[in-house]
Amino acid sequence: MMDTKVDQTIQPKFYVDKKLSKSFDNKLDEDIFNYPFKKESFLKSEKFSFEHTKDSLWKCIKEKAKKKSDMEYFNCVNNLCCKFICTIRKYVKYFLYLKDSSYEIYNINLYNNNNMNIINNKNITNNKNITNNINNSFSNDYINYNHNYNHLNNSSSSKHNNYNVNNIDEKNIKNDYNTYHNIYEQIFFKYNPSFYEYLMFTLMKKLIHYKNYIFNKTKKINNSYNNNDIKNIDGFLIFQNINFEEIFLNTFYSSFPFKLFLHSLYMIFICFIYFVVLYFMLLKKIYTHPFIFHLSVLKFLFDIIFFLSFILYPLFLRLKRIDKIIYSSYISSYIFVCVTFLYSFIIFKCSSYSVKMNSNTYQNNFVFQNMLFLLINIIYICIFCFLKNYMILYSFLYNCRFSIFCILFIFLYYYLFFSLDFYRIIHLPLDNFFFPFLCFLFFSFLFIFKIIMSLYYEYVYEKKYRILFVKKNNLIEKRITKRKNTNINNAYFTKYFSIDNTIPTSPIEDILNNFKHILETINIIEENPNHNLTTNIMKIKEKIKNCDNILRTKNINQVQIGKYRKFEKVYNIWCLDKMYLNYPLNQEETKSFLSNSLNRISFNSFSNMHSLLSSKFQEHYNDIYDWNGNIENIYKANTFISIGYKLLYPLGVLEANFDKEKLKKFLFRICSYYNDIPYHTSLHAAQVAHFSKSMLFMLDMNHKISAIDEFCLHISSLCHDTGHPGLNNYFLINSENNLALTYNDNSVLENYHCSLLFKTLKNPNYNIFEHYPYHIFISCKKNIIKAILSTDMKNHFEYISDFRTSKEFIDYDNLSNDQIWQIFCLILKASDIGHSTLEWNKHLEWTLKINEEFYLQGLLEKSLNIQNSFLCDINTMNKLALSQIDFLKHLCIPLFNELNYICKNNDVYTHCIQPIENNIERWESHKNDNQNLGLHEKYKEENLLSKLELIKFE
């Protein structure tokens, strides 16, 4: 009885709490509410208070729901049967929505004016039902023209003086149009027409309706867009902006592999018909030689294998680049047409030597049979080209070239026929030859006309969606305030990544995004109040409810990695150095860089003086700081000392009593802290410093910031890994190292690097800030610590999210101190992983170094009986490739995309993002490479415990 009362009290309260709290996102097992709380552990505790019961229930539900969710995920990912079923479902879905879902455009109404809304409501829905319209909704055009000719003339003449043709209401015309056709159709069928008359009647209906549909649709589309949208597209429907073209193809034609799959299925069916009709009904009666049979079978097998390869090609190779699939598809299509023509040529050539000239009747029949053979091959090629244009609808330029190529080969068939059969044709009576040849020309030109019509249909279809794409992107650019000469697409799209849909977001960012959607929906309602008013109001309510739920989150600035399953694994491996972790650790909110008591007037005057003078020095070093420059060749001596002196001296010398000898001593001292380990060496620090300076030039910030800020950035980059032992934070925490105990397991190594730096600066022999004002030094110290701590990968997505929430409100020509150092943190983080942007050989070299360092840590973990980290046992190329693909896609590209948002001249995309994408492709090619990296043999007798002595802890 007691249990029942407790249940009745708790269950309604728990339902309310669950609706208000969204902290647990996994599926819940609702069956648990049917159980009374009679668990032994609960009863023994003798605590029947409401809160303890609620906690027990919540814990129980979380455990069971997590197990259920993990089991479902395991089945979906690892079960081959489920994979097969999912694949079949996906293709069935594509088949049902081939014409509308394949070219889905998000938020079309958001970017269209009233004219464009007409297109969305009519043309796009018509596109979905085009097949039904052609078969079921024709309006009896042909009959209407005959029966109601006088009536139409009278009505038009009576209104000619009062109305312009363009001002006539379309709905009235359409209603009259359908009425006339329905009346005539009833009269027509009363007279019991013959089958031939009925066939011609249906054919003319379809042809006229098809013609009206295409040309009316083209006229509406051309009248709906202004000239500015069309100017961005050339005559062959290619964007003048190269980035637009690539983004458009990868975004709106992602279903191309399936359409190729469907086209190949149709063609396999047509191949069977082609072979049966051609050989068993024609060639077998003409030729008795076995060579013809073998040749026909060989051609049939070639066609089957050809089309079957494009069914298996997208399924098994799993290529993610559409341009590779389309290129191979169209190149092979040319080969297919050439092989078909070659087959026809061989058959004709054989016929010229196998037919006797003394039998006129036999020769006459043979010429007609050759003509029929030629016509079948022409139809076969035309059907192949027609289906390719009409079904795939990929690129008008590609299909236009291929269609012209097919038409040229059709005329080659004519030449082939007249050249090889000329001596037979001249002996034929004109009366016997003329009519068959006329039929031959009619059917061949009919199919050529179908190719041209399919090409025109594709042109209209693709032009509409390209213009909508331009319209959408132009309006997105207008909404970005205080941004001049910025290409918004470069900031948001890459070949492998779309930031708006992929990167994990923080709750505060979700709130801002919901508010943006609310404002956009309000704008839609203001522009067109009568269009989907109820739906738009429901959207606003839903977004407000989402904001209300998000505001109940404990820390709205923390990125909820656990909500993104594909990011959770990568985050745990690369950012937390762990394979399994359910929830990210809570982080304290970052505080302001500058103290409120700081004398900003004196600071700004000091900074501006440095900025004006330092610009003179910086102009001499623009060429040296190329992003892809080889620093080992540029600085042939001690690279770290050379690049450090080159970066710091022109900025530090602006201070009156700056001591360059003390700067050299400081650099030598910091360099001595770097250990002889594979990756985190002084060369890595020099590379990061070079990257940070180069990034300032690419972002055009070198003349907008003070010299003291740049001075601190370069010190941060040179010292960000000083004293690194070649072990990560996870190892130091698990081994309870003194460093982890000192810094309370919080950014252990990063705090250690800061500590070494400022302990060095405390020594008068190395204090390069000795003559700086004290409040300037305090500010510099805070900024340097902030920058070095940002290199902890645990907070990687938090830094990206913080910038994303504020980037649209930043005036990049007049940056505040906080904004400068927010960008500097991103620059230092990007420079720290900058080896991902190098060309393949250099990138591979640095990757092997970091993997070697991880491997050594794994050996040390085994010797100390510590749980082995995930990245510390990679000894083959395929495992390394898998880890690097995730690292480059999910960690590197999002960060460089944010920097590309600031860049005005596309340099970040060219020098950073494109090389990363190229490196991803190279790693993709090594996914099946089982090459041994040789680390086990190299470190078989390594003294691993000596690595612990590398930590210079005092």
UniProtKB/Swiss-Prot annotation:
Q: How does it sit in the membrane?
A: Multi-pass membrane protein
Q: Which residues form the active site?
A: 680
Q: Where does Mg(2+) bind?
A: 721
Fetch the SUPFAM superfamilies from UniProt: HD-domain/PDEase-like
List its EC numbers.
3.1.4.35
List the Extracellular topological domains: 281-296, 349-365, 423-432
One Pfam family linked to the record: PDEase_I
Q: Cytoplasmic side of the membrane: what ranges?
A: 1-259, 318-327, 387-401, 454-954
Q: Which residues cross the membrane?
A: 260-280, 297-317, 328-348, 366-386, 402-422, 433-453
Q: What does this protein do?
A: Specifically hydrolyzes the second messenger cGMP, which is a key regulator of many important physiological processes.
Its EC top class is: hydrolase
Q: Which residues bind 3',5'-cyclic GMP?
A: 680-684, 721, 832, 884
Knockout consequence? Knockouts at the asexual blood stage are viable and have normal merozoite formation in the host erythrocytes. cGMP hydrolysis is reduced by about 20% with no effect on cAMP hydrolysis.
- In its UniProt entry, what is this protein called? cGMP-specific 3',5'-cyclic phosphodiesterase alpha
Positions of the PDEase domain: 586-930
Q: Which domain of life is it from?
A: Eukaryota
- Look up the record and name the pathway of this protein: Purine metabolism; 3',5'-cyclic GMP degradation; GMP from 3',5'-cyclic GMP: step 1/1
Instruction: Name the family.
Output: Belongs to the cyclic nucleotide phosphodiesterase family.
Q: Which InterPro entries match?
A: HD/PDEase_dom (IPR003607), PDEase (IPR023088), PDEase_catalytic_dom (IPR002073), PDEase_catalytic_dom_sf (IPR036971)
The UniProt annotation places Zn(2+) binding at 684, 720-721, 832
UniProt keyword list = cGMP, Hydrolase, Magnesium, Membrane, Metal-binding, Transmembrane, Transmembrane helix, Zinc
Q: What catalytic activity does the UniProt entry give for this protein?
A: 3',5'-cyclic GMP + H2O = GMP + H(+)
